[in-house]
Amino acid sequence: MSKIIIPANYTPALNLYDTQRAIGTVKRLFADTLCATLNLYRVSAPLFLEASTGLNDDLNGVERKVTFDIKDSGTEAQVVQSLAKWKRQALKDYGFRVGKGLYCDMNAIRRDEELDNLHSVYVDQWDWEKIITVEDRNETYLKNVVRCIVSAVCATEMNLHAMFPQLQELPLHTPNVTFVTTQELEDKYPDLTPKERENAFVKENGTTFLMKIGAPLRSGKPHDGRAPDYDDWDVNGDLLFWNDPLQCSYELSSMGIRVSPESMDRQLTMAGCDDRRALPFHKAVLNGELPYSIGGGIGQSRLCMLLLGSAHIGEVQASVWDAATREACAKAGIPLL
């Protein structure tokens, strides 16, 4: 059963026809702007991966993957949950050099996702990855990339408002970003849950990049789960916006500088995942065979939601919803695709 919120007096800014046009516009403009800003090139992405490679994303380590066998090859395949690890391997395999990177249109199925206004079992995002030097593995470099992404969001929004005057009633986002660590957030709001801390901070400060996600805080608990084998927990984070219709913090992107051999070694042990050391991808990282990189995923439907002022992700993507969600949205005049 999903947990749906119906905002009071909500009306979609665009009709269904214009919504489809706007979605296409957002996806085209943002991808072009992001590529130009970060020096990225589009590559084709897999829909599923062989299970034995270890390239699929384990997310928080408890989500079940969609798995099936392939008759002719006799192998087991998994529908991707994200391409965080695959992209880094692809940078090497495709011959990318320092300062250049790739992006792809990633489509995933997350069967254990808890459905609500922001979460669907269908995930569509721009997955991107870029080769950096070892000297670039620092907060300053990470913050500069975050600012580039936010600038691309704002540029896309400006063009969208020019093409669809109906959207000019919505507030424009600014390129300003506030940076804060998970420990600073816990210190500021010790009596709130992690999600409540995000809501309180982003409501007050606007667009925020929340840094250092994965390792335990002084309370003994991490702010949120993070797989130990792609992001370096010291130089990663979530890009958060304020969702005005839902009055909550809203994650557009999870990203970070990727693990070095040393940080993967440390994080695998911290997470109790030492068994992964035998997998091909993990061996390659631990042996220093893959390039240093930075990367992340940027939600396509989430960006469309943000820029169209939508109240439910089902307004901008076609997915499967429970009967209660469909009935509540129909009653409130929220059209699900």
Question: Where is each model-derived feature located?
Answer:
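A translation/RNA-centric and nucleic-acid-associated enzymatic feature enriched
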Residues: 109, 180-337
